[in-house]
Design a protein with these regions (language model features):
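Extended alpha-helical rod/solenoid/coiled-coil scaffold segments used as assembly/tethering elements
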Residues: 1-182
Length: 182
């Protein structure tokens, strides 16, 4: 039966795990689009008319959520197995924070991406010479186009995200969107 070191060697191995797990969160963030400046709410992300980036952001959120839940368990297992002299130095909190950072970036990609899709229609609507209109119809084409963007995006997000992160997306979107409208 082979044995393994529960001292310095195991401590070094867990440090390597921490480094690799932190790098993995950066790889996930790297799968997301880079921010564009110029939004009234700070950096914005665009996911265009296709849904590939939207889907990737949801996958990043789901993967980072899983990792953020399992990393503390890994830390607990290492602390159980490692020598007492090293146990108090085993801390995976920074790694867990990396995954929460990835989630936050992905949620921001989703909320500002939807905002960017809507802004095209809102900007067109704002440029209309409304004072020249004599009467108002039942529903403007702007309302229909804004509704269609929401119908195309929001149900897909609801299907792909857990309730917690769908709510986080909604909160983030409303915060940035209302700041533009008010």
């Amino acid at each position: 039966c082979s044995g393994y070191s529960t001292g310095q060697t195991m401590y070094q191995v867990q440090k390597e795990y921490q480094e690799v797990l932190s790098q993995y969160s950066n790889v996930m963030i790297g799968k997301l689009p880079k921010p564009h400046s110029g939004s009234g709410t700070g950096a914005s992300y665009r996911f265009g008319d296709g849904n590939a980036v939207l889907t990737m952001a949801c996958l990043v959120i789901n993967t980072a959520e899983y990792c953020s839940e399992t990393v503390p368990q890994l830390g607990d297992m290492v602390r159980e197995k490692i020598d007492d002299a090293f146990a108090e130095h085993v801390n995976f909190d920074a790694v867990e924070d990396c995954y929460y950072d990835a989630i936050n970036v992905a949620v921001r990609v989703l909320s500002t991406g939807l905002e960017a899709r809507l802004m095209t229609h809102l900007n067109s609507m704002a440029k209309m010479p409304w004072e020249s209109w004599s009467d108002v119809g039942d529903q403007s084409p702007y309302v229909a186009s804004i509704h269609q963007v929401c119908v195309d995006v929001i149900p897909q997000l609801r299907r792909l995200l857990s309730e917690t992160y769908f709510r986080s997306f909604c909160d983030s979107f409303i915060t940035t969107f209302l700041a533009l409208c008010v």
